[in-house]
Amino acid sequence: MQVFQVKEVHSQADAVLEGATQHSVYHPDSLHQPQSDWLAEEVPVALVYNGISHVVMMASPKELEQFALGFSLSEGIIQSPADIYGIDVQNACNGIEVQIELSSRRFAGLKERRRSMDGRTGCGVCGVEQLAEIGKPVAPLPFTQTFSLSKLENALVRLRDVQKIGQVTGCTHAASWIAPDGTLSGGSEDVGRHVALDKLLGARAKQGWQQGAALVSSRASYEMVQKSAMCGVEILFAVSAATSLAVDVAQRCNLTLVGFCRPGQATIYTHPQRLSE
């Protein structure tokens, strides 16, 4: 993993930016004069469980321990962080390998249901053996909280702060955890929206955040709803729209799904009883 020294990043002097690289670009008014710009890095990341490669994802090369934990939880590979004995991030010849040591019980379960998913890039259909596995049932979520929509405004304003790479490249998605008082407990960014969410879910499990809601800078696909529900997230806010399958899954698993989140604006798709003004 490389850390790049940035002399000037859109008025940020002497900044340090991980997950971006410089490249020569041209603009219409200076086609013969190259200029330096910053691009978000995208690398293959292999998740390897007890020595067996399970999945390869395209991702930003940062916060990969959080990603491994979040992915393991959101895919039902583990039930709690205690099921993982160790995580080791290693550079490989063509990307990065994340070596994950699972408990014997969880690894046995993974081998039983293991499916061919090589090359998956966040698509929930890729590598699934049968169409019946799409939108698989998730245990219904309990109703344990009420969240004030007035607290969403501050979170939307602060979401950009999570995207350090995105601010200089325009090329990342963000996922943040909103505490009940509207402050951001933490957040993650990645070139892939599903990976950004998995990183957040990993951070949430590690930090023990319970009450509150997840906020993503992208649309809400069914897989993002399913991942959230698998991790016990009761409320998911998305800056863009939700798909019809995402709404169906959210309805079935009792997740409150809200899209088109802007200051003073929101579209509530499911279970509005968790929300207040």
From Swiss-Prot:
Provide the GO biological process annotations.
Answer: Mo-molybdopterin cofactor biosynthetic process
Which residues constitute the signal peptide according to the record? Answer: none
Ligase among the record's keywords? no
Gene Ontology terms: cellular component: cytoplasm
Q: Where would you find this protein in the cell?
A: Cytoplasm
Pfam families given in the database record = FdhD-NarQ (PF02634)
Source domain of life: Bacteria
What is the documented function of this protein? Answer: Required for formate dehydrogenase (FDH) activity. Acts as a sulfur carrier protein that transfers sulfur from IscS to the molybdenum cofactor prior to its insertion into FDH.
Q: What protein family does this chain belong to?
A: Belongs to the FdhD family.
The name under which this protein is listed is Sulfur carrier protein FdhD
The record lists the organism as Pectobacterium atrosepticum (strain SCRI 1043 / ATCC BAA-672) (Erwinia carotovora subsp. atroseptica)
